[in-house]
Swiss-Prot record:
This is Nucleoid-associated protein SSP2277. Homodimer. Residues 1-41 are annotated as: Disordered. It holds the Pfam family YbaB_DNA_bd. Residues 7-16 have a biased composition (Low complexity). Keywords: Cytoplasm, DNA-binding. SUPFAM superfamilies: YbaB-like.
Amino acid sequence: MRGGGNMQQMMKQMQKMQKKMGEEQEKLKEEKVQGTAGGGMVTVTVSGHKEVLDVEIKEEAVDPDDIEMLQDLVIAATNEAMNKADELTQERLGKHTQGLNIPGM
């Protein structure tokens, strides 16, 4: 029954890891990251859970004759913020899954 003991130990380790990852995910909810575009003319703030929290657009970014530029800036800033949130998530959760081959992590 030696294999059973190893399995129990592995299950305990997995439960411990799940608990730590759950705690990290809760912390991520409170984290904020920003993406900017146009030299800071547009700033998007998202949570660690990739929820858009704020969009700031400086007055000089608004040109009624070139709405497409503003749209592009908002998209670029949002994408940058989302990428930073992904990196933060990977950094925080990755330390708990090192060495494990878990799809999506």
